[in-house]
Amino acid sequence: MTVVVFGASGQIGHFLLPRLRARGEPVIAVSREPHADSEGVRWVRGGLPDAVPTLSPVSAIVSYGPLQPFARWLAAAASTGSPCVVATSSMSAQSKAASEVPAEREIARQLQQGEAELVAACEVLGCAWTVLRPTLIYGAGRDKSLTPLARRAMRTRAFPRPIGGGLRQPVHADDIALATLAAIDRPANRVLMLGGGERLTAGDMFARVQRSLPMATLPLPVPTWLLRLVRHAVPRLRGPLARLDADLVADNSELERLLDVHPRPFRPDARCWEPG
């Protein structure tokens, strides 16, 4: 059973590859950058949608990259047979759909369009499929949300703490890897939300990140009036700051029922912010 993985060098692939090796499943990892082969993993150079070498039939294809290029490659890749397909989207497909920021609404539209194109390609090819919509990802030190905050705090010894009452549900990258394996074994043929095993306020989430750091940092509460000022003065922060009091959570009931995956609660430690 050979598994092709796009995005294998990313934060979820960091956890998926060792788990596939532990199952004894050969892996073909596709990357734009060269990598040395390792036991059970063969790396090939390629990029979606039109710079991927011809692949012989495989049992499963996993993609952690942009959906639309992957869907378009898959639709034209008849040589792969009818493998099981697992791909990640994002809960931003929902949470940013009604954003006040046009660029964020466009992100949501592209995610939804990519999901639709992938499902259509799978149905034409007769592939079983699962699309995972994770919430805020952490755990490998490669995310663009919590890790930059943690590293900045370690450099400056100060941790800005926005006061946000909206709920968050961070999901560990390894739990997405576990969900991927479950979807290979039991394809759901649907889009599944994937949040962490715990919901907490944005303020509590930032507090736990601060407590996880390997050195003491000074908490700097950011008052609401300052957040409003920054929201209007810095356009690129308008969307994220507007969502501080919004609930950005996932309903894991279908994930648990169909894949029997139960993500861990949010208990970060210092290793979560180290580059994996």
Regions found by a protein language model. Give the residues of each.
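Flexible, glycine-rich beta-alpha linker
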Residues: 130-148
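N-terminal Rossmann NAD(P)H-binding glycine-rich loop of SDR-like oxidoreductase domains
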Residues: 3-23
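Mid/C-terminal beta-alpha module of Rossmann-like enzyme folds, strongest
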Residues: 180-239, 257-276
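Residue-level signal for the nucleotide or nucleotide-sugar donor/cofactor binding architecture
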Residues: 109, 144, 168-171, 200, ...
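Active-site Tyr-X1-5-Lys
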Residues: 105-130
